[in-house]
């Protein structure tokens, strides 16, 4: 598992990343930090898998049905990605398909929060007996553009050893700790980027950036550092000043009224 905060010098270009299709984005993102200016030449390790399936299937049933499919080859120590499009022929009825415990759902079109989820994706690991257990909801719908990919799970397991993790400490800040950076690169967090965050390295404010397409990060140099991350919502300072001024006006008014009464 990748740490909550870590440093890495494996930097992948944001521009290049945007050219990748799913699922090739998955391991590329996991094994690199995606930043504005990156030079990593990483190539996705996902491989197309032939499941021996037709390109499309029509499901027409009056009740929920469970089916088991035996895979043509062993997927031991592999991660399986499945994806396909769903065409709901009865849009006033929801469609859900669960594969090995992972559920995707297309809500009915009359739902107050219609999700428009017509593309189902599944990321499946630890497949037992090389079987896929599939649960189809009742309804009339078509599955098309079925695609499958595999990835050796070692590519995921080894990543944790390749990054420098932050040793977290307790403190008043949102995140506080020390880190020993092997090579200059980027500090990466799992915090969604927001202008209210302030990162300090060795008690000095640094410029934060959007990394990994949507998260908070910043540049960091090689060596041992102390890291602290604080969060102050936008407008916090001006709001604090206005509140303080408002309080002072109330206090001064109170003092003035008391003085006026004493003089009377």
Each language-model region and where it sits:
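Active-site-proximal, structured, solvent-exposed surfaces of multi-pass membrane proteins
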Residues: 1-264
């Amino acid at each position: 598992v990748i740490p909550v905060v870590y440093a890495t010098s494996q930097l992948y270009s944001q521009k290049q990343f945007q050219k990748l299709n799913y699922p090739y984005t998955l391991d590329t993102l996991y094994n690199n930090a995606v930043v504005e200016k990156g030079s990593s030449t990483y190539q996705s390790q996902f491989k197309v898998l032939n499941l021996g399936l037709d390109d499309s299937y029509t499901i027409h049933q009056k009740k929920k049905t469970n089916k088991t499919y035996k895979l043509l080859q062993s997927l031991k120590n592999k991660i399986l990605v499945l994806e396909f499009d769903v065409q709901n022929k009865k849009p006033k009825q929801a469609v859900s398909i669960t594969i090995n415990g992972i559920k995707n759902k297309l809500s009915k079109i009359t739902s107050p929060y219609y999700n428009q989820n017509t593309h189902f994706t599944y990321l499946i690991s630890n497949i037992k007996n090389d079987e896929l257990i599939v649960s189809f909801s009742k309804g009339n719908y078509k599955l098309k553009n079925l695609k499958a990919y595999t990835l050796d799970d070692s590519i995921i397991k080894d990543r944790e050893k390749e990054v420098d993790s932050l040793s977290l400490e307790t403190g008043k800040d949102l995140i506080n700790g020390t880190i020993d950076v092997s090579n200059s690169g980027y500090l990466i967090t799992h915090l969604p980027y927001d202008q209210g965050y302030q990162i300090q390295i060795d008690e000095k404010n640094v410029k934060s950036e959007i990394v990994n397409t949507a998260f908070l990060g910043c540049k960091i140099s090689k060596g041992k550092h102390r890291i602290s991350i604080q969060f102050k919502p936008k407008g916090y300072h001006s709001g604090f000043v206005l509140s303080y001024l408002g309080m002072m006006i109330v206090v001064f008014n109170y003092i003035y009224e008391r003085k006026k009464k004493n003089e009377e």
